[in-house]
Amino acid sequence: MLNKFKPGEILLSLAKPNKKKIANIADFSNVSLNLSFADLNDLSFNIPLKARYNFLMKPNHVAKLMREWYLIKAEFLNRVEWFVITGLTKSENEEQTIQVRCQGLPYILHKNKIRSYQGVSKNLQEVATDCLKGTRLNIGYIDPSFNEKRRSFDVTSTRYEFLKTIWETFEAVPVFDTVKNTVSFYKKDTVSKYKGVQFSPERFMIDMEDTIDIDEVVTRLNITGKDGIVINSVNPTGQSYLDDFSYFLYPFKRDKNRNVITHSDYMDDDLCHAILDYNELVNKEGSSFHLLLNQKRDLETQKTTQENKLFTLENIELQQILDKITVAKKAGDDTKDLIKQRDAKLLEVTAKKAEISRINSQITNISQEIEKLKDRLSMDKFLGEELKKQLSYFIFEDDWTNDNIFDETELYEKGLEELSNRNAPPVDIRTNIVNLFNVNSEKAFWDRIYLGDIIRVVNKNFRTDVKATLSGMTFDFDQQSIQVTLSNGKRARSLEQEFANTLYTTKKASTEYNKKKIDYDTLLVNYNARNDRISSPVANPTILNNGTAITHVVNDNGSVDISIEWQFPNSKEDKYNIDGFLVHCYSDTSSDTYIFGSKMSSEQYLSVSYDKRIATLTGQVSNKYYTFGIQAYRTVEASIDSSGRILSDIIQPQFPSENPYLPSNSVEVKGSLSGRVNGLYTISTEAKPEDPEKGTIWINPKNNKQELFNGEEWVVSSAGSADSLNGFTASTTTSPNSIPVRNESGIISGSIDGNAEMLGGRAASDYALAENIPIPPKFAKGIYTGDGTLSKQIPLTFTPDLVKITPISPEDSQLVIESQLGGYAYQVTSTGLSLIGGDLGYGALGNNLFVTGSDSNCRGNKLNVKYIWEAYQQN
């Protein structure tokens, strides 16, 4: 328990590399502790070469024990962090000290290298396991969404650099636990929350430095993906770059008659008018460009297919007939039938050439339309020479590449995100605050200010009002102050500013229905080069229809490893001569049947070699529905198929419980768990944690007892075994025949017989009878995606008294249902919020279920809208 000193102070001790403590460090000075969000912490301090022992100055025994690569245990802010000593500097001066320099314990990964690692289609758990294999660090918690994504890696670096590449690739936030030697991976919005803390000159702030760097602003971003792909085909302007001049346009505003209401701080009115006019043109005609490009791409695909067929007709089939005619003539055989075959084949060749010519003509026409549209959407032509020169002053150009993205649609969407993060000067604020962790009156803030938290900084003199991530903390324990760095945030905007900003940029192109690409070039490995000339179609795999094709194993952290098996003949026939199988997987909270290709951005792909008949997806969420598909493939030469591959159909399981497959209705956790549940740390171990954080829940697996650490002590929140009743321990002396019968888990499972009159010193009348104890209220919640049907029924395990349905979309309203006769929706009136409805069109309650709206408005069940529901039963 770290309650012997104030959280704002620091305790240090020295340990060997196995963490065995060998000395407390009582005499130290000039401590500098730098904490960094999503990176390594560092620590430095001085210790004297001599120390006072019983009023005598003697050589400091700690200085003698100090070694590089030993460990330092630091206790501060009710936390424990381990550091590795990376340097010692001995100074023979007036003070005679040793400066000790340390890095966070994960620094040891810098000393171990990965050479030529290649991982294809790996989720975060798989690639992180490869990275940490054989090291002291293990994987802790992984947000389930990261195991539903797959990325490929080609790395030669230190293990720490590799680990950093992993979390950056998956856009995860690493959290190192140097006590348990683990690294966990969270979504940023999970660890970065605004807890209502504000720094200002009136509150905590000593001084402040707010840096605005225009060099960091980007208004034009050139975007490329894997193998140089660009966004022209999905960008409404048809360009390979994105523009956003909103920072320099603000606060320009005009009415519908083009009268200027507010001038821009930077741009002339003529230029502002021209940019807004251009945006309106792009919003109006940009979709036409996308449609034309899709038509051209489809025609080019058709052309390639027909050219392949022409090659087969002309260079293979016709040539075979001509060879037969030559042989027949030399042998003096009749060639009449062969000549008929030749003439018929020549007619096929002529027809195929005519078809290709027609497609070429269509491609030419569409190309001309595209060029005309490009000309109309050319910003340079639209602005003219004079305005183009004015705009050039505000074009801050940069390049952005993401080699993990091979699909134009995903690249376009990620490019928009990147530009939105760089279209204004980044937040870079450094401020010194008082060390409030030493002030008992500020105790309420102790667990609300730490790395990753979002802090609001307000300074009226600087006109600063910003919410940003607390990315760094430097403690000066001698001066009782903390230097805080805040970054990666946005300057506060009013609603008027937010609305104005939507006018300054073109609308995002709708990409919801775009077919996304599969990275076949990376996924499909040529395991068998001897079949590259086989042009025969590939046979379909088969999946047993008896419910045994899919199985799963529950991991200690509650995730599951799901395996699917299939069948495919081992045969030398061409149709069975393949390179491998591509496993498709889609997960959802809905039990609806899924067709592959519907939401390709949410699909996972895994490639296995031709000799395998089973594949396993690791670290998946246990209470989701999984749809699997198996596809056989053969990689071939381009002359056989221009795509370089021949694919079978995607075969899905047909057994009802396997299409889709639900591993479990809930998340089952066993063994040792370290992770967040509803914002709290949950740990399930036989031994009670020694240095818990506030809010830690400990579950004793022996008796299922739960205890919550409130920052000072453990509080029992529930008990699996009956050790007491209403706080009184059962008395066996006053009531001789009181015999509790427990099962192997420690839970009372038998009845208590005899004539006992007392229990825990209380008479029977002091205790309530079961029939007099009120039944506790029931509650359930869940998520579903609307399918557009009327009166959709959602089953429950109890009959509800009240149901709330909240859409995660502005396309629908929240429903409040408290009757079998109908529900209500909120409406905004001049006096505030009120309810409207009262009929079945707004949903209804039922026995062990609730029902969504019954009319054509489909309230509570609009197509593709996601809903969160809550059901209550009051007793």
Swiss-Prot record:
Keywords in alphabetical order: Coiled coil
Top-level taxon of the source organism: Bacteria
Coiled coil regions, renumbered to chain: 351-381
Pfam families in the record: DUF7359 (PF24058), DUF7360 (PF24059), DUF7361 (PF24060), YOMG_N (PF24049)
InterPro entries assigned to the protein according to its UniProt record, in alphabetical order: DUF7359, DUF7360, DUF7361
Segments forming domain Fibronectin type-III: 537-648
Disulfide bonds: none
Protein name per the record: SPbeta prophage-derived uncharacterized protein YomG
Originating species: Bacillus subtilis (strain 168)
